[in-house]
Amino acid sequence: MVKLGFVIAEFNRDITFMMEKLADEHAEFLGAEVPYKVMVPGVYDMPVPIKRLLEKEDVDAVITIGCVIEGDTEHDEIVVHNAARKITDLSLQYDKPVALGISGPGMTRMQAERRIDYGRKAVESAVKMVKRLNDL
């Protein structure tokens, strides 16, 4: 059984809550277990908890769940690009998948609501990657 850790952003929680629920349902559908869930203030705060989860022997992959909505500045782009870069670095450092279930940047609230399936897609990706890496 694949064991997943979720790191979930509280910012735009109405949207990340829906993303989390779809991710939970899909993990159960795929027969994966989610023994760890960590809430963080925002997407930019994800790297340290991701690192801690990746250090655990009973975590096969980490799922990130977040939503970054466009504002009046380029803040959304800076947040997502830097988080994605560091998340990828951690995946390579620990040799475990970290699936990007983060919607944004450059989207409106309405677009974000239409993208709540990103959490589900991240679970799908992580479970596939764990199984394929185990076969190498």
UniProtKB/Swiss-Prot annotation:
Q: What is this protein called?
A: 6,7-dimethyl-8-ribityllumazine synthase
An example of a GO molecular function for this protein is: 6,7-dimethyl-8-ribityllumazine synthase activity
Per UniProt, the keywords (alphabetical) are: Riboflavin biosynthesis, Transferase
Subunit field text: Forms an icosahedral capsid composed of 60 subunits, arranged as a dodecamer of pentamers.
- Organism of provenance: Methanococcus aeolicus (strain ATCC BAA-1280 / DSM 17508 / OCM 812 / Nankai-3)
Q: In which pathway does it act?
A: Cofactor biosynthesis; riboflavin biosynthesis; riboflavin from 2-hydroxy-3-oxobutyl phosphate and 5-amino-6-(D-ribitylamino)uracil: step 1/2
Q: Which GO terms describe its biological process?
A: riboflavin biosynthetic process
Q: Quick one: which residues bind (2S)-2-hydroxy-3-oxobutyl phosphate?
A: 72-73, 115
In the UniProt entry, which residues are flagged as the active site? 75 (proton donor)
Which chemical reaction does it catalyze? (2S)-2-hydroxy-3-oxobutyl phosphate + 5-amino-6-(D-ribitylamino)uracil = 6,7-dimethyl-8-(1-D-ribityl)lumazine + phosphate + 2 H2O + H(+)
**Function as written in the Swiss-Prot or TrEMBL entry:** Catalyzes the formation of 6,7-dimethyl-8-ribityllumazine by condensation of 5-amino-6-(D-ribitylamino)uracil with 3,4-dihydroxy-2-butanone 4-phosphate. This is the penultimate step in the biosynthesis of riboflavin.
Q: Which domain of life is it from?
A: Archaea
- The gene that this protein is the product of is ribH
- Binding residues for 5-amino-6-(D-ribitylamino)uracil, per the UniProt record? 11, 43-45, 67-69, 100
UniProt lists the family membership as follows: Belongs to the DMRL synthase family.
EC class, as a word, reads transferase
The EC number(s) attached to this protein equal 2.5.1.78
Q: Which GO terms describe its cellular component?
A: riboflavin synthase complex
